[in-house]
Amino acid sequence: SAHGRTGSRAGYYHFDFQTKEAIAFIESVIKEPVHLIGWSDGGIISLLIALARPDLVRSIISIGTNFHWDVGLPFDEEPTIELTEEDRAKFAQRSPDPAHMQEEIIRKAYAIWRKEPNMTKADLATITCPVLVLCGDDEPFSNHHTIDLFESLPNAQLAIVPGTSHAVVKERPETVQSIIKKFNDDLKTNDAFPITKMPRLRKEKQELLLAPQDEVE
């Protein structure tokens, strides 16, 4: 989301545009199903890829992600944009866009965040790959929204890291790395489906997985 080295094009920053770009990259460069890790907008795009092309997604780690725009995010109609000299220098070094585009891109982002994404719980229920929902306990959106995301996904795990915000990756890097490593290790067994002692959401599927094969058949 505007952090790369590609210049701005028509339709840029809309989630549909970014999803199509990501799908094209997977198809043309990686050429096989992938494990996706997305932070913030990247998490949204990862979920949208799984909705559009489930055949391309093996698993998702979704960090600090909202699935709908209407969750009380603090985006003013006309945001105050304050760019430091360091911000401007990094943009000039990285982006082929002219300098004035930096502020325009930020304003475009705010405008889109006020209207997108528009996923529903019913949409999320169709994503069958393993998903790790990871976030801080003080995100810009409510923890209830994060729990709705988690409980709407049929094969998901939830990690809320205490004492962190939307910058959880930077605030508790060792904790985040440990959680991600455990999830990735578990992908080797039952597609990261955890077998627990007292399941509620996972009870039906766990019973099916643990049933003798002749009973399943």
Language model region names:
Residues 162-217:
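Catalytic active-site module of serine/aspartate enzymes centered on a nucleophile-bearing elbow/loop
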Residues 146, 150-167:
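Catalytic histidine neighborhood in serine/cysteine hydrolases
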Residues 107-123, 137:
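Active-site nucleophile elbow and catalytic-triad environment of alpha/beta-hydrolase enzymes
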Residues 140-145:
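Conserved alpha/beta-hydrolase "acid-adjacent" motif
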Residues 1-37:
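Active-site loop/oxyanion-hole signature of alpha/beta-hydrolase fold enzymes
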